[in-house]
Amino acid sequence: MTEPSRTLVPESIHRDECVSLLGAAALARVVISVKCLPVALPARIALIEGNFVLLASSDPAVILAAERGDVVSLQIDGLDADGLTWSVMASGIAKRATGQSPPNEIMRQAFDRGATFVLLPLSVVVGQRG
């Protein structure tokens, strides 16, 4: 006799844990609209004061979105020790960061290579595990 298949039901991740996962991440997908189509682009990230994410990107579309004050989302995902996957998405109105010094070595390297910093407030933060 075969075992019945186990169906995983995704569970929501509390905002505080989502922010913690964002704080531990160094890389994310920045999700923007380019000519009315969704685009996901890689960017280095750093959590600032638990309320903002600083993105480092050299992509002109990301920089333009920040200069226009577009709604931008970022997404990270991972795998727990027990094999469950998780995903966190944060969204807010982006703005180009001026006068922001690189908060860590990874961001400093991006800045030295010509990346522009974009500040994203954590207006909406959602996550799920499953």
State what each model feature region is:
Residues 51-52, 71, 93, 124:
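Structural motif
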Residues 56-61, 122-124:
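Secondary-structure transition/turn motif
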Residues 23-27, 68-69:
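A short, compositionally biased
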Residues 25-58, 74:
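Short beta-strand segments
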Residues 1-22:
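Extreme N-terminal tail/first-helix region
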Residues 116-130:
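Charged phosphate-binding loop/patch that engages nucleotide di/tri-phosphates or the phosphate backbone
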Residues 58-116:
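Short, structured beta-strand-loop surface elements
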Residues 34, 76-78, 121-124:
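Short, structured patches in soluble enzyme cores that scaffold and shape functional sites
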